[in-house]
């Protein structure tokens, strides 16, 4: 079973969300998602300053197996991207919940966070797949 940190929120599309300061959240893909994709070769990062809607594709993870869209779990403005992934996309595989984060988003509606899955609900989703 994949590692599912209890302090994070999750989307049904296998993104995770970690609360930072002042309405900002860090986003990445889950361990389960990176296991399905295999070794990352490139991550197409979103543009800082871009406004995204919850559920909209805003980045792409390319692996040896496939290219997969990464979706914004909440609406808001992209305030940072993980530039380390330009040279080391494998961080998404080796450390998906810390060094392999993909972008940071300033929430336009923090109520959307409550609609995301907690760790137990995400684990249940994985069991059903």
UniProtKB/Swiss-Prot annotation:
HAMAP family: GcvH. GO terms for cellular component: cytosol; glycine cleavage complex. The keyword Glycoprotein does not apply. This is Glycine cleavage system H protein. Its cofactor is (R)-lipoate. The gene is gcvH. Belongs to the GcvH family. The keyword Transferase does not apply. Disulfide bonds: none annotated. Binds 1 lipoyl cofactor covalently. Gene3D superfamilies: 2.40.50.100. The modification N6-lipoyllysine is found at residue 65. GO terms for biological process: glycine decarboxylation via glycine cleavage system. Residues 24-106 form the Lipoyl-binding domain. The glycine cleavage system catalyzes the degradation of glycine. The H protein shuttles the methylamine group of glycine from the P protein to the T protein. The glycine cleavage system is composed of four proteins: P, T, L and H.
């Amino acid at each position: 079973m994949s590692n599912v940190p209890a302090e994070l929120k999750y989307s049904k599309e296998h993104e995770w969300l970690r609360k930072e300061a002042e309405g900002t959240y860090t986003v990445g893909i889950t361990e389960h998602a990176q296991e399905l994709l295999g070794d990352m070769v490139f991550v197409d990062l979103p543009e800082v300053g871009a406004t995204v809607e919850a559920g909209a594709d805003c980045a792409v993870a390319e692996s040896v197996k496939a290219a997969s869209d990464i979706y914004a779990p909440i609406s808001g403005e992209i305030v940072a991207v993980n530039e380390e992934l330009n040279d080391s996309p494998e961080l998404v595989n080796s450390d998906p919940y810390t060094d392999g984060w993909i972008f940071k988003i300033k929430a336009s509606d923090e109520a959307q966070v409550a609609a995301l899955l907690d760790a137990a609900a995400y684990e249940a989703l994985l069991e059903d797949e």
